[in-house]
Amino acid sequence: MVNSQVADKEKLDAQTNNQDSVATIVTTENNKKYTIPDSEKKIVYSTQNLDLWYGENHALQNINLDILENNVTAIIGPSGCGKSTYIKALNRMVELVPSVKTAGKILYRDQNIFDAKYSKEKLRTNVGMVFQQPNPFPKSIYDNITYGPKTHGIKNKKILDEIVEKSLRGAAIWDELKDRLHTNAYGLSGGQQQRVCIARCLAIEPDVILMDEPTSALDPISTLRVEELVQELKENYSIIMVTHNMQQAARVSDKTAFFLNGYVNEYDDTDKIFSNPADKQTEDYISGRFG
């Protein structure tokens, strides 16, 4: 296996010699290969030999994946392949399941989040989460946005007002809601609720935003607005998004990881994944032959 990996690497280096960027080839334990083009962007997350179990169910197997900052990284794959489990591992939300066990490392900004001394609270401040179903609190729009800052000790009303406006502008919904800040968020449309949830996430100034099927419950117009917002947000945030929608992944992401049966089957630039995938199973999935 080692000799095979070395041969693959030497062959790839020869092919890319004299080019501006050189790709790194990775061979996973199940012999799936994926390439990660070198980039000037920093690595925000490096997953190394990650295995995860729910009881006896081996949900993630030997995951090795580097996520670049200020990119949108799409996680695709059929139901049950480990997509949502993976992103919930990135902020340790999987630990809410009593039977979960992990092995391997997830480095966030070069620190292993599984280290005993690593603060889960700090991690979840730096890494925000937007869920599949819009989940505003049963409070006013204003109180939804200020919940996180208040939890972190901010009490000054002027500062809170500024956070509310900045966050709602960041979620591209300030103009729609600026005159309704003290009305209940439950009275908003589904698309508006989801953008309020994104604004609530932005209010704590995260570094990374995890999105688990953020538009699956939305109508086409609301979906388009959220997709446009994702493109704007990547200027300041690193976004990792699970989606079943192949067109969405192709539209909004810079890189795509295809998960299959708990493995990373293929990972590359999104354009390459959708135009010239290296693996037959990847091609079959994105063309709709299974999934």
UniProtKB/Swiss-Prot annotation:
Gene Ontology CC terms: plasma membrane
GO BP field: phosphate ion transmembrane transport
Main location per the UniProt record: membrane
Record GO terms (molecular function): ATP binding; ATP hydrolysis activity; ATPase-coupled phosphate ion transmembrane transporter activity
EC number: 7.3.2.1
InterPro entries: AAA+_ATPase (IPR003593), ABC_transporter-like_ATP-bd (IPR003439), ABC_transporter-like_CS (IPR017871), P-loop_NTPase (IPR027417), PstB-like (IPR005670)
Topology of this chain in the membrane: Peripheral membrane protein
UniProt keyword ATP-binding present: yes
Pfam family, one: ABC_tran
Catalysed reactions listed for this entry: phosphate(out) + ATP + H2O = ADP + 2 phosphate(in) + H(+)
Binding site for ATP: 77-84
Enzyme class: translocase
PANTHER family per record: ABC TRANSPORTER I FAMILY MEMBER 17
Subunit structure: The complex is composed of two ATP-binding proteins (PstB), two transmembrane proteins (PstC and PstA) and a solute-binding protein (PstS).
Record-stated family: Belongs to the ABC transporter superfamily. Phosphate importer (TC 3.A.1.7) family.
Protein name as annotated: Phosphate import ATP-binding protein PstB
